[in-house]
Curated annotation (Swiss-Prot):
Region entry G4, spans: 297-300
Highest taxon, organism lineage: Bacteria
Region annotation G1: where it falls in the sequence: 197-204
Gene3D superfamilies xrefs: 1.10.10.2480, P-loop containing nucleotide triphosphate hydrolases, Translation factors, Translation initiation factor IF- 2, domain 3
Pfam families xref list: EF-G_D2 (PF22042), GTP_EFTU (PF00009), IF-2 (PF11987), IF2_N (PF04760)
Record's subcellular location: Cytoplasm
Protein name: Translation initiation factor IF-2
UniProt-annotated stretches for the region G3: 243-246
Length: 686
């Protein structure tokens, strides 16, 4: 005989779980609740107990007789009580029925539950739950909300498992785009590769060389068109290349929360070595957390020195495999097509190690690579499908816009009906132009896609009106206190390399309350737009030492709400960062002149002093403003207003072309012709 639970035994023998638990207690058998398992020995003992308690035939006859008599009596009472007894019996029967309802093994809830709702889910009376809460020291009514911990406490007391449902709004589909699929549904997908490097080191030549050698060779008659991405086939395996301007794939897309790249090819010219933009590219790739393969280009040139390139890159933690590191270095000549096959094989090798997989059997999700408005076709968007399969006719939501996929064109200009994971396609059918880096998701229902698209557009509009929560020194302390910041990302730019190194070394030593400083990029020269975009994507603060931001950088910083700090003394930078981390950053104020008044007449009043009868010539004079007295162009006194009146009434301000009476705090030497200049101190937005 297998084990049986207390409530199952009770149900089998038509007795309540409570009575059975009482019986077990009398038999000195310990049970914690109705879910306790009873072994064969206990079951046999119970069977014997209840067998012994069964009434004899004579007893049964007596009981039956009593029941018959009671029925007769009840019939008499029915006539007297006008059906009241019937109702009582019905209620009693109803109560008995609720007692026999089986308790569930598991309940689910979302957010919170009222006492009444919890009782219903547990198949219990609300009064019983209230009693249990009272025993736990919680005074509750039937409509009172219970939190997660209390729900779990009560349910566990009954031996019932609790599961909280987290409801995610469909408008925020980014939150479940990256949800892990079951391993059995995952299939191998092509790697997505971005090529980065310094200007004139051969990025475009390398892309052209790969495209010409692989795409056109395999697609005779196919017209290769520029859609921002393309695929090549190597050893029966595909690789997707993003043909986007330099660092855009990492910056604007990462700033918008999109991770599109799997592998970065860092192109370094063998005759030039590591240059400023090379370092920038390394920092972008590291911030995105993707593997780097170094392509040492221009090996055909006489001045080519690959060993120098390797040596320089070790300073940035890119150590070649030949030197005991884990970075793959491939010597190539993009212009002559040498080493290209080896580079592609290395990409396949990294793909194999990293095991890039996706689930093709679901609705497509992915990222916008490029988008534009065409006079003939309308909105055209290049999408990179990252998971699932996109089909012609699918309703789709892209960023804050929506539509239906009317047509899909591959990277070789052919119309296609389906696009699987890691496939770039150009689509038409969207109602507005999305932005590069926007996420997309296909839906089953066009009506739902429209609703979600419109909701997202509305939410984006509201969010735009609100403040962006980028990291700044003003709110740094608060964010540290709230536990939002564990590491402060900084970008350091200075006039000379020595200053950069000195400042970076000093900043790295700062450690306040376990929050450390991380330098994500350093450079010599003016603060550029690229620095601001990296800061925005990495939520960093930009520090400038003896350098200024250029016009584009200033504009982008304002748009992206990136905090720029400019200094001329190193220890001031350190002091400011430490003060901000400790919550002691003093606000900066600047003076703003708000108005001027001319003294037309003066009056001496006992116990009051000199009252100046004035005429406001410019702006306004306010009661709480600071003032300075100017006589013949020279400031002779600076202080505060004591009173500001119009006729006999105290006023808060007097506007231009109106007369007023003014007294100055602790100053009476006012003369006709004096100018009273009013100013306020405004906090400078850093």
């Amino acid at each position: 005989m297998s084990k049986i639970r207390v409530h199952e035994y009770a149900k089998k023998h038509n007795i309540s779980s409570k009575d059975l638990m009482t019986k077990l207690k009398e038999m000195n058998i310990e049970v914690s609740n109705h879910m306790t398992m009873l072994d064969d020995e206990v079951v046999n003992k119970l069977d014997n107990e209840y067998q012994a308690e069964k009434p004899s035939v004579a007893d049964e006859f007596e009981v039956e007789e009593k029941v018959v008599r009671s029925k007769k009596n009840s019939n008499k009472k029915k006539k007297k009580g006008k059906g009241n007894e019937d109702k009582r019996q019905e209620n009693f029967a109803g109560r008995q029925q609720t007692q026999t309802v089986e308790t569930p093994d598991k309940i689910t809830f979302s957010g919170s539950l009222t006492v009444g709702d919890l009782a219903k889910k547990l198949s219990k009376e609300p009064s019983e739950i209230i009693k249990k809460l009272f025993m736990l020291g919680i005074m509750a009514t039937i409509n009172q909300d219970l939190d997660k911990d209390t729900i779990e406490l009560i349910a566990n007391d009954y031996g019932i498992e609790v599961e909280e449902e987290v409801i995610v709004s469909e408008t925020e589909f980014e939150t479940f785009i990256d949800e892990q699929d079951d391993e059995e549904n995952l299939k191998e997908r092509p790697a997505v590769v971005t090529i980065m490097g310094h200007v004139d080191h051969g990025k475009t030549t390398l892309l052209d060389s790969i495209r010409n050698s692989k795409v056109t060779a395999g697609e005779a008659g196919g017209i290769t068109q520029h859609i921002g991405a393309y695929q090549v086939e190597v050893n029966d395996k595909k690789i997707t290349f993003l043909d986007t301007p330099g660092h855009a794939a990492f910056t604007t897309m990462r700033a918008r929360g999109a991770q599109v790249t799997d592998i970065t090819i860092l192109v370094v010219a063998a005759d030039d070595g590591v240059m400023p933009q090379t370092v920038e590219a390394i920092n972008h790739a590291k911030a995105a957390g993707v593997p780097i393969i170094v392509a040492v280009n221009k090996m055909d040139k006489p001045a080519a020195n690959p060993d120098r390139v390797m040596q320089e890159l070790t300073e940035y933690e890119l150590v070649p495999e030949a030197w005991g590191g884990d970075t793959i270095f491939v010597p190539i000549s993009a212009i002559q097509g040498e080493g290209i096959d080896n580079l592609l094989e290395m990409i396949l090798l990294v793909s194999e190690v990293e095991e890039y997989k996706a689930n093709p059997n679901r609705y497509a999700t992915g990222t916008v690579i490029e988008a534009q408005l065409d006079k003939g076709k309308g909105t055209i968007a290049t999408l990179l499908v990252q998971n699932g399969t996109l089909r012609v006719g699918d309703p789709i939501v892209v960023g804050t816009t929506f539509g239906r996929v009317r047509a899909m064109v591959s990277d070789i200009g052919r119309r296609v009906k389906v696009a699987g994971p890691s496939t770039p396609v150009e689509i038409t059918g969207l109602n507005e132009v999305p932005q590069a880096g926007d996420r997309f998701m296909a839906f089953a229902d066009e009506k739902k896609a429209r609703q979600i698209g419109e909701s997202r557009a509305q939410e984006a509009l509201l969010a735009q009106r609100g403040e962006k929560s980028k990291l700044s020194l003003e709110d740094l302390f608060q964010q540290i206190q709230e536990g939002d910041v564990k590491e402060i990302n900084l970008i350091v730019k200075a006039d000379v390399q020595g200053s950069v190194e000195a400042m970076a070394a000093s900043l790295r030593k700062i450690d306040v309350e376990g929050v450390k400083v991380k330098i994500i990029h350093t450079g010599v020269g003016a603060i550029t737009e690229s620095d601001i975009i990296l800061a925005s994507a990495s939520n960093a603060i930009v520090i400038g030492f003896n350098v200024r931001p250029d016009v584009n950088a200033k504009r982008t910083a304002e748009l992206e709400n990136v905090d720029i700090r400019l200094h001329r003394i190193i220890y001031k930078v350190i002091e400011e960062i430490e003060a901000a981390m400790q919550g002691m950053l003093d606000p900066e104020f600047e003076e703003k002149v708000i108005g001027q008044a001319e003294v037309r007449q003066t009056f001496k009043v006992t116990k009051v002093g000199t009252i100046a009868g004035c005429y406001v010539t410019d702006g306004k004079i306010t009661r709480d403003s600071g003032v300075r007295i100017i006589r013949d162009g020279v400031v002779i006194y600076e202080g505060q207003l004591d009173t500001l009146k119009r006729f006999k009434d105290d006023v808060k301000e007097v506007a231009q072309n109106y007369e007023c009476g003014i007294t100055i705090e602790k100053y009476n030497d006012l003369k006709e012709g004096d100018i009273i200049e009013a100013y306020i101190m405004e906090e400078v937005k850093r």
